[in-house]
Amino acid sequence: MEIQVIDDAYLQCQQICKNASTTFYSSFSALGWEKRRAVHAVYALCRWVDDIVDGDEEPTVEISDELTEQTKQRDLMLRELHSGSEPSNPQEIHNQRLMALVSIRNKLHQAKEGKISPNDEPVFIALQDVFTKFSIRLQDFETIIEGMEDDLFPVMCNTWDELRSYCYKVASAVGLILIEIYGYEDRAARLHAIDLGIQMQLINVLRDVSEDYGRGRIYLPKDVLSSHNIDVEDLSNPNLPQNPSWASFMREYLEVVRRHQTSAVHLFEYLDPRSRVQPRIMLDAYTKIFDEIVRRSGDVFSAPLKLSVTSKMSLWMKINYLKIRAKLSAE
């Protein structure tokens, strides 16, 4: 494939990253050119599948008899996996989104095998190049898509293990891809990358609890809620934070987040200074959200949880500080 086609594909992935988050996009710039482009491609793929499942992007695929049959078989398997539950969306919308995910999975296999053409989506052109340069496992991409497929159905996590499994699929698997791009000195880095992903997604679950409830997605473990005398239906009550049972649940939940966070910080010991910047900023950003949850005494219902302007400025300054340190370390 011509170099210009590949370069153009990477540029489109870069633009997707920039449009999604200028703060995190800036943190990528500490990486070398080759690693930075690879991270853009991975992030663009993750953004794409997430938007498809949440309905933020209308999926378009080239329909064929083979793809239709693959989608049908995948749907049957997922229904069985979800104990016969009906999809969260009307059948037509469900089929469109699932078919898009099946098609993306097929294209990832083609990218791994070097069979992507110049006429394919730019993200697959870029990822095909990424596969040739880094030891990325196709399995981790498939795990991400499995997590997206789960969200096509009503979700009810019952235990901590089920919640961690979900977090692994949609967050830790991404981290396992990224550290293969960053490079690391010891395989222990993978364990800490897994905990970083779980820690971030556990915070996402709290941040989005009301929105997810409206979509039929209950990630907070039902059995744990019950042990604190909270019913799933109580999650629709904006006054729940005033209930002492919620305070009790939050103490347990936040302690679990802290344990994963304690492990996550050790990831940086295995990365070179330039590769530390992006995950360091991610950890710091989520820690700020976590601290805000603590400050609000667990009230994640009354107002959106997001980074303040001051926090964003603080992160921007830290990005530049870490980039300078990384540059000096490399000299």
Regions found by a protein language model. Name each.
Residues 1-200, 210-331:
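Catalytic cores of Mg2+-dependent Asp-rich isoprenoid enzymes
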Residues 205:
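Short, contiguous alpha-helical
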